[in-house]
């Protein structure tokens, strides 16, 4: 077991790429990770890969060298963060119809919008002509978002297409749209969907919120609050460190680390409120 003193390296990554043999890839990836003490979740689909894993510095390095043996996954870029506590309880490799589930067919997810570098994001979205859309779920948005961003109020990514169609009803197709999410994959797929609706000026934050927080330092940025993450850290602060300021959604009291480890889908409640729920 990795010592707490050493800490854990957390790597989040994705790539939209045709993986015709993704079924065969599952046991190979799972065996590799288990043999090196790597834990987390890897999602495989015909349209690509999406994952967040954690382990020692050496094991994570070996994992990406392992991916390099596949031409389709070579040179994978990933977002790195760190934690003193183990972020995942087990290693899972899941086979899915979509690498991130939007729930619809009929559009090419490779026809994404244009990237905006984190260093240029604040200036770009400050224009009154830019509509900034948060593509995350409502329980994520509650913890933090970019100032002035539109919250679709969706409880899952599958609800986004219906919201987007309704939002688009009274919008000109040359409307400028900027989208963001946690690590980049949902907003990237969302831009492809918006383009399928006819929007021409569609942009998204490169690497998502996590990359932004790593790149743009200081209290004068447009980011407000904490960033929800899908592991036992639950949320990270502006320094991409595990948040120590998470509040119970029912009583607004402080939630400690032992409470956080049992949280799912943003149901962030202290022990007393969970007993009463």
UniProtKB/Swiss-Prot annotation:
Q: Which GO terms describe its biological process?
A: tRNA modification
Q: Name one Pfam family in it.
A: Rhodanese
Please report the stretch or stretches of sequence annotated as the Rhodanese domain.
126-221
**UniProt GO molecular function:** oxidoreductase activity, acting on paired donors, with incorporation or reduction of molecular oxygen
Q: What are the UniProt keywords, alphabetically? A: Oxidoreductase, tRNA processing
What CDD domains does the record tag this protein with? RHOD_YceA (cd01518)
InterPro entries assigned: Rhodanese-like_dom (IPR001763), Rhodanese-like_dom_sf (IPR036873), TrhO (IPR020936), TRHO_N (IPR040503)
Reactions catalysed according to its record: uridine(34) in tRNA + AH2 + O2 = 5-hydroxyuridine(34) in tRNA + A + H2O
Q: What class of enzyme is it?
A: oxidoreductase
Q: Which family does it belong to?
A: Belongs to the TrhO family.
NCBIfam families this protein is in?
A: PRK00142.1-4
Summary of the function given for this chain in its UniProt record: Catalyzes oxygen-dependent 5-hydroxyuridine (ho5U) modification at position 34 in tRNAs.
Q: Any idea what this protein is called?
A: tRNA uridine(34) hydroxylase
**Organism for this UniProt entry:** Anaplasma marginale (strain Florida)
Q: Which gene encodes it?
A: trhO
């Amino acid at each position: 077991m990795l010592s707490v003193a050493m800490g854990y390296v957390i790597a989040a990554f994705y790539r939209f790429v045709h993986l015709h043999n993704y079924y065969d890839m599952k046991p190979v990836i799972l065996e590799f990770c288990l043999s090196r003490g790597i834990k987390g979740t890897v999602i495989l689909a015909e349209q690509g890969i999406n994952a967040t894993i954690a382990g020692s510095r050496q094991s994570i390095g070996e994992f990406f060298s392992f991916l390099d043996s596949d031409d389709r996954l070579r040179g994978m870029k990933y977002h790195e963060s760190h934690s003193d506590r183990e972020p995942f309880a087990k290693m899972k490799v899941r086979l899915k119809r979509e690498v991130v589930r939007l729930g619809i067919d009929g559009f090419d997810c490779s026809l994404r919008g244009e990237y905006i570098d984190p260093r240029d994001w604040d200036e770009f979205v400050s224009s009154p002509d830019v509509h900034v859309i948060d593509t995350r779920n409502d329980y994520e948005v509650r913890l933090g978002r970019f100032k002035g961003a539109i919250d679709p109020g969706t409880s899952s990514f599958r609800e986004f297409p219906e919201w987007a169609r309704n939002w688009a009803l009274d919008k000109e197709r040359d409307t400028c749209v900027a989208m963001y999410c946690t690590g980049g994959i949902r907003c990237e797929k969302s831009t492809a969907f918006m383009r399928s609706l006819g929007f021409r000026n569609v942009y998204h934050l490169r690497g998502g919120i996590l990359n932004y927080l790593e790149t743009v330092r200081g209290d004068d940025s447009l980011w407000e609050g904490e960033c929800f993450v899908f592991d036992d850290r639950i949320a990270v602060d502006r320094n991409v460190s595990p948040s120590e300021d998470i509040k119970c959604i029912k009583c607004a009291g402080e939630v400690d680390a032992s409470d956080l480890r049992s949280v799912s889908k943003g149901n962030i409640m202290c022990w007393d409120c969970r007993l009463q729920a």
